[in-house]
Amino acid sequence: MIRSLLKWPGGKSRVMPELLPHLPKAGCLVEPFVGGASVFLNTDYRRYILADINPDLIRLYREVKSNPELVIDLARPLFATGNSKEEYLQNRRIFNGTKGLLDVARAALFLYLNRHGYNGVVRYNQSGGYNVPFGQHKTAPYFPEAEIRQFAEKANDTKAIFLCGSFQNTLKVMVGTDEAIYCDPPYLPVSETANFTQYHTEPFTEKHHRQLAAELLEVNRKYGAPVVISNSDTETTREIYHRFRLHEIDVQRSVSTDASNRQKAKEVIGVLKVCEGCGRAGGGNCPDCGPCCGDATYNAMVAAGAFDEQGGF
């Protein structure tokens, strides 16, 4: 298993064995919530479109793809001397307050803050300031030099495209029939006390989940793209994503101050239920599923001569 260069709460490295059988075959994988990029690193699609609303995350990935050795050279001294609260807060002030900071320098600082902050949490205040406290590490955090190089190699070999934007804008790049979508949005809370659902500077609410489910259906019906999602296993999740076939899994939670108290939680992997004939949810008006989405798909099949040998037309 290839490890992420970041510490990332909710990262998929631990559940890749369960997730991989559900990821569809396609030429290109589109991820509107790339996060720690474990799915990218541990799959074999020819191309990738990887997006997130967090500009610091996408900046890091772009710089690692373009300038991996420079990122390593700038980050190494930060890791060598920065394992104290005082150094961390000073570097956080530089990250938040220095105008004109070069992209590669900001990328190196973001990597440092992620690895030295509290449990890899990435959090901002409403003004966009990074506000994660120091993590109080007993030993110096791991410097992911090998992971940086692995990421750069994979990103360049697959010509990965990194986009900074909302899931709505990311899904607009869907233009072909050889693309699959995997979505790992901020999880719906399992309780009132477990409500970490931040999406960069704003909460990712139930309303956003409903919008996401609707847009995924629309993209599938328009292009036939297969869709897979991950989320917490709650009644709300099952109601919002009822068009998906949900597979239950157990996952070790990682956002906790005490590793001994981290318990397994129920999650779901959702695979959009589609017609085997046309690959669309609810059908695309093909002979297997009947009229559901208008005449476009059926007429295209007729025009292409799909039924000529059957003597129907």
Where are the regions a protein language model picked out?
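Cys/His-rich microdomains that often coordinate metals
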Residues: 279-285, 293-296
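SAM-dependent nucleic-acid methyltransferase catalytic core
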Residues: 1-14, 22-25, 68-182, 186-196, ...
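Class I S-adenosyl-L-methionine
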Residues: 245-274
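Short, polar loop motifs at secondary-structure junctions
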Residues: 33-38, 147-148, 231-235
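Conserved S-adenosyl-L-methionine
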Residues: 22-80
